[in-house]
A protein has these predicted regions:
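Short beta-strand/loop motif that positions the catalytic acidic residue
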Residues: 220-222
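Bacterial N-terminal signal peptides
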Residues: 14-26
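N-terminal cap/lid segment of alpha/beta-hydrolase-fold proteins
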Residues: 33-73
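Bacterial N-terminal signal peptides that target proteins for export
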Residues: 3-17
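Primarily recognizes the serine-hydrolase "nucleophile elbow" in alpha/beta-hydrolase
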Residues: 89, 136-214
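Serine-hydrolase catalytic machinery in alpha/beta-hydrolase-like enzymes
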Residues: 55, 65-153, 265-266, 271-284
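C-terminal catalytic histidine-bearing segment of alpha/beta-hydrolase fold enzymes
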Residues: 246-312
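Conserved alpha/beta-hydrolase "acid-adjacent" motif
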Residues: 227-235
Length: 312
């Protein structure tokens, strides 16, 4: 088991690579055509849930391989989970973060599924609602994700052995809790996961309860200055995962970076968010250096755990 700390020349990020020990650091029906401004390959689908909720999702099937590569009939896929602000910008189209992610993954040959947990329940966002007052909790979103994974694995053209899941903020928290719940309450027919990647999740409850997660390759990308979902609980929780044989956890902590460091908007104080470490609000916004580094790390991670898809 190895532990390594890496700093870029400008100290843009620190990498906590935990290969097993921490040393000194603790099939729905299409319901609409692609909206204007969305990627051309986009389909919108509906996934009926056992609860009676119909989960809407955005679906980008992987590009078809050329005729010369027709034997490569299945491609890897990624399930992507939105944050507390929901999937959409004010104009009603996918926000730039999710649109960019979908386009990048799709161009690389991956299928992409993005469930809309909020819109499916008549919600736009929950960022301004205290955790204790939210009508939709993380466990609800975990159930959404589990149903979405089953649907995704059943789609023609998807390699059910190579499915990854990722999430940002509340979606990252959901991703981590998904790994915990799949270990505690396994379900017959669920696909295995090839890997999971999260941006700035909330890890406090996981650390408090010393939760144990499904052992899959895990990439955690955190902001050192995050006062909304602080990095340290995630670093500490990642260290507890070392106790499991064969653990594969990598944590990147980006210096001078707040919540949303992978975005392009400038950092601002959000006094409307009551869930941070300060009563005065939280900071949110991008860090150009951390953005480049984190997106490159994400791309490398997917190549490692999902493989390189057959080019269309």
């Amino acid at each position: 088991m190895t532990f390594a700390l890496y700093l870029s020349p400008r100290k843009a990020f620190a990498t906590l690579a935990l290969a097993g020990a921490c040393v000194g650091v603790c099939t729905g029906a299409a319901w609409a055509q692609s909206p204007a401004g969305e990627p051309a390959a986009l389909h919108q689908v509906e996934l009926p849930l056992p609860s009676g909720i119909v989960l809407r999702a955005h679906w980008w099937p992987a590009p078809r391989p050329s005729s010369a590569q027709a034997n490569a009939s299945v491609q890897p896929a990624v399930l992507a989970l939105h944050g507390c602000g929901g999937l959409y910008a004010k104009a009603g189209v996918l926000s730039s973060r999710y649109r960019e992610t979908a386009e990048t993954l799709h161009a690389a040959g991956y299928a992409v599924l993005m469930p809309d947990s909020f819109g499916s329940r008549g919600l736009r966002d929950v960022c301004q609602t205290r955790y204790s007052d939210r009508s939709l909790n993380v466990n609800d979103r975990v159930q959404d994700a589990r149903a979405a994974l089953v649907w995704l694995a059943a789609q023609p053209g998807v390699d059910a052995r190579h499915i990854g899941v990722m999430g940002w903020s509340n979606g990252g928290t959901t991703t981590l809790n998904l790994l915990v719940q799949r270990l505690i309450h396994p379900r017959e027919g669920e696909p295995t996961l090839a890997g999971a990647a999260v941006f700035y999740p909330g890890c406090g409850p996981l650390l408090k309860h010393q939760a144990v997660a499904e052992s899959v390759p895990l990439l955690m990308q955190l902001g050192a200055l995050d006062d909304w979902t602080p990095a340290q609980p995630c670093v500490d929780w990642a260290c507890t995962l070392k106790a499991r044989a064969g653990s594969d956890v990598t944590v990147h902590v980006y210096e001078d970076s707040y919540h949303g460091f992978d975005g392009t908007a400038p950092v601002r104080l959000r006094g409307d968010v009551p869930n941070g470490t300060s009563a005065h609000g939280v900071h949110q916004g991008g860090n150009p250096t951390a953005r480049v580094q984190s997106l490159a790390s994400l791309q490398s991670f997917w190549k490692r755990v999902l493989g390189t898809p057959t080019a269309p």
